[in-house]
């Protein structure tokens, strides 16, 4: 498939001498052969989060029958003014739709969207598209909290096995979580993971430490080591490298990864990973360009649409009966009989929540927190009982 282009290599593809064709021209779609797609990545193929996005772009290209030359990718683009420069360069090269994959890119993508109103800008994990007033600005994410919950069930079953065989005492059943930043995206994810584990292992608690970086192998490894030293008997992560699983493999501690299958670095300890199929969105958005139809301002899909999942269970490490339980939980998520943030499943300072508002939006109704229903980005940022978050 295509090779990712670093920002310094933008000259590889010459700027088109003809005026670009846009999906909004008289409501007509773009002819497939005229389409150009730009992608801005925070990392590269060596970092799991970006690798998952690259896989999604490849999937979109294959499904829609595009050519490698129609996809221009820029890797290692930081959350700074260089992101605007990358977006402007892609627009100047004739890209009619541009994707950016990191939370901190949003300010600069908004700036570019204002400067290039005929180009569609799609930003992953962001929050400002709806309020920006820009019709060409879009946010997208997946219901990754669902996959976090399911991977938590896998972890909880492993903890039960460890309790039963005497490896862990029931009253000392503590998980550790390597978080990137104390943002709602991370809090939502680790809370869902914890609730999944707690649904099958009621005595579990969890400790969270932050690296304050989306992707740092050394910091993630150090953080996992510190959690293990604090008595955590199973580790998960919302951080983008293999640092935490590497630490777990060395220590013989079970782990649940993120973005990609971690068995290549932790064959004896990895259980599964929470993962997203970004190809579902990329295919949808680019198909909209071809059809001349509007792209959703906020897009978020989950298990039912195949947008998030857990990676293959590691038969070498998971507890007996895990596959059957996972199927049961996934089916319940898909048919709507299970809600990850069911308020009867957690307390805050010993009390069950019946209301939680952000601005004028009430997130709790019908007995659960309605995650990602009022915007694509996660909103759950509540500190619940059973989880200790260390932000130092």
Q: What positions do the PLM features span?
A:
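Gram-positive cell-envelope targeting signals
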Residues: 1-29, 97
């Amino acid at each position: 498939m295509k090779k990712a282009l670093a920002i310094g290599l933008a000259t590889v593809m010459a700027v088109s001498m003809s005026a670009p064709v846009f999906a909004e021209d008289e409501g007509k779609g773009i002819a497939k052969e005229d389409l150009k797609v730009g992608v801005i990545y925070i990392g590269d193929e060596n970092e799991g989060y970006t690798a998952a996005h690259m896989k999604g772009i490849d999937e979109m290209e294959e499904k829609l029958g595009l050519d490698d030359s129609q996809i221009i990718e820029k890797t290692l683009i930081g959350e700074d003014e260089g992101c605007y420069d990358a977006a402007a360069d892609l627009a100047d090269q004739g890209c009619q739709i541009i994707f950016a994959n990191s939370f901190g890119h949003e300010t600069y993508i908004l700036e570019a969207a204002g400067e290039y109103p005929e180009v569609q800008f799609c930003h992953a994990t962001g929050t400002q598209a709806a309020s920006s007033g820009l019709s060409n600005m879009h946010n997208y994410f997946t219901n990754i909290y669902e996959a976090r919950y399911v991977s938590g069930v896998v972890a909880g079953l492993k903890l039960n096995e460890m309790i039963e065989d005497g490896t862990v005492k029931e009253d000392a059943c503590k998980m550790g979580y390597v978080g990137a930043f104390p943002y709602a995206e991370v809090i939502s994810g680790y809370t869902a993971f914890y609730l999944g584990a707690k649904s099958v292992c009621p005595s579990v608690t969890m400790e969270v430490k932050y690296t304050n970086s989306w992707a740092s192998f050394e910091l993630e490894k150090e953080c996992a080591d510190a959690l293990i030293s604090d008595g955590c008997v199973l580790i998960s992560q919302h951080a983008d490298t293999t640092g935490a699983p590497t630490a777990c493999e060395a220590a013989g501690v079970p782990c649940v990864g993120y973005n990609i299958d971690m068995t290549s670095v932790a064959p004896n300890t990895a259980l599964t990973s929470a993962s997203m199929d970004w190809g579902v969105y990329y295919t949808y958005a680019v198909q909209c360009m071809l059809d001349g139809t509007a792209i959703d301002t906020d897009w978020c899909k989950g298990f039912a649409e195949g947008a998030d999942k857990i990676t293959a269970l590691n038969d070498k490490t998971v507890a007996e009966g895990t596959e059957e339980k996972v199927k049961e939980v996934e089916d319940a998520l898909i048919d709507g009989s299970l809600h990850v943030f069911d308020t009867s499943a957690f307390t805050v300072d010993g009390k069950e929540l019946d209301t939680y508002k952000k601005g004028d939006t009430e997130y709790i109704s019908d007995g659960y927190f309605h995650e990602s229903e009022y915007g694509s980005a996660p909103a759950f940022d509540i500190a619940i009982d059973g989880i200790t978050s260390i932000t130092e």
